[in-house]
């Protein structure tokens, strides 16, 4: 499965998950899920932890991530990048979108901005 298909799958799955939602997909399979957290960075940590719990120490390596709402700061994506995520899809809309995108780009990863939120309570 190519990165584009993985991002599409992660984005579609993200619609049905309780906010704040972060999903990790690798090889056509959901490998990590962080949801229902108060902060987006905690949801990122939860998704990475679940990936490691069920896939081993390198659980998130090579995965892509989806977020149901924008990243207000670069700390959430940094958690994902540090775990080995290669691409992130998110709706955008933060005042700091340019900063977050620049940080992801500088790390050598890709970020796709959809313009559509899945965030809900």
Predicted regions and their residues:
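Glycine-rich, charged/polar anion/phosphate-binding loops
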Residues: 7-11
């Amino acid at each position: 499965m190519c990165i584009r298909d993985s991002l599409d799958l992660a984005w579609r799955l993200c619609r049905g998950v309780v906010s704040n939602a972060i999903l990790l997909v690798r090889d056509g399979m959901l490998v990590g899920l962080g949801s229902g957290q108060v902060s987006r960075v905690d949801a990122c940590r939860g998704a990475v932890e679940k990936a490691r719990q069920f896939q081993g120490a390198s659980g998130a390596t090579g995965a892509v991530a989806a977020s149901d709402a924008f990243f207000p700061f670069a700390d959430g994506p940094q958690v994902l990048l540090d775990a080995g995520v290669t691409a992130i899809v998110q709706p955008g809309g933060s005042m700091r979108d340019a900063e977050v995108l620049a940080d992801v780009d500088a790390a050598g990863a890709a970020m796709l901005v959809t313009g559509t939120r899945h965030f809900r309570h």
